[in-house]
UniProtKB/Swiss-Prot annotation:
Protein family: Belongs to the conotoxin I1 superfamily.
Disulfide bridge partners, by residue number: 2-16, 9-19, 15-24, 18-35
Coiled coil (residue ranges): none
Positions of post-translational D-methionine modification: 41
Gene3D superfamilies, alphabetized: 4.10.40.80
Protein name from the UniProt record: Iota-conotoxin-like S11.2
Length: 43
């Protein structure tokens, strides 16, 4: 889920987006939009 509200990433898209592997990134990630290979914002 998202870092602050702990809701599923798909619930609040402006918080974070989930990749198939389940990690999250800011929706403003310009390198891989909505994706991350690290634990950033994963909780």
């Amino acid at each position: 889920g998202c870092k602050k509200d702990r809701k599923p990433c798909s619930y609040q898209a402006d918080c974070c987006n989930c990749c198939p592997i389940g990690t999250c990134a800011p929706s403003t990630n310009w390198i891989l939009p909505g994706c991350s290979t690290g634990p950033f914002m994963a909780r």
